[in-house]
């Protein structure tokens, strides 16, 4: 099994690669489909995995991942435990702005098996962005896909003058203004 590293391969020209990790296959497919449908000025390659580490056999075929998105289903404790185990298989350099957590199912709080505060603490601990999304709504999936594409473009270095290191400060300032 191979640890995922951000800088061990050459970047692709005018392209970005994303790794979606989560136990819910339907959520991964919905999000990937929505991202591929969106108009964009660069090529997007999306790889999906239920958990990390990735199998070593196909390592030579994999692109350099510009961003890793962890999907956490708040209705499943297994989802959280799988993500926690997967985080240890990720190179620490990814946590320099190239990791995002997407929590799903938070709209029905009484059915949540995973506390929202736990997921917030997880994202804060890893200095990563946290997005909330309801995959029952097509509009919400589209909005999440658009936001992830904007972040991916920055992580891939396709936005001049902006580094993935700035994503945390950009996202925290937008979260503060959204609260009012």
Curated annotation (Swiss-Prot):
GO cellular component, one term: nucleus
Subcellular localization(s) per the UniProt record: Nucleus; Chromosome, Centromere
Keyword set, alphabetical order: Centromere, Chromosome, Nucleus
Protein name stated in the entry: Centromere protein M
InterPro entries: Centromere_Cenp-M, P-loop_NTPase
Pfam short name (any one): CENP-M
Taxonomic lineage of the native organism: Eukaryota, Metazoa, Chordata, Craniata, Vertebrata
UniProt function note: Probable component of a centromeric complex involved in assembly of kinetochore proteins, mitotic progression and chromosome segregation.
């Amino acid at each position: 099994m191979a640890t995922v590293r951000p800088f061990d391969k050459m970047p692709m020209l005018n392209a970005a690669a994303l790794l979606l990790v989560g136990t819910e296959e339907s959520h991964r497919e919905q999000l990937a489909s929505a991202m591929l449908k969106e108009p964009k000025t660069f090529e997007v390659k999306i790889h999906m995995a239920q958990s990390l580490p990735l199998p070593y056999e196909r390592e030579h075929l994999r692109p350099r991942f510009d961003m890793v998105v962890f999907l956490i289903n708040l209705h499943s404790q297994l989802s959280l435990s799988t993500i926690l185990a997967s985080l240890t298989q990720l190179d620490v350099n990814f946590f320099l702005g190239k990791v995002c957590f997407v929590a799903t199912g938070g709209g029905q709080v009484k059915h949540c098996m995973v506390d929202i505060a736990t997921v917030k603490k997880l994202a804060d601990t890893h200095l990563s962005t946290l997005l909330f999304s309801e995959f029952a709504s097509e509009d919400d999936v589209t909005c999440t896909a658009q936001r992830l594409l904007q972040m991916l473009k920055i992580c891939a270095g396709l936005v001049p003058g902006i580094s993935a290191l700035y994503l945390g400060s950009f996202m925290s300032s937008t979260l503060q203004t959204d609260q009012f």
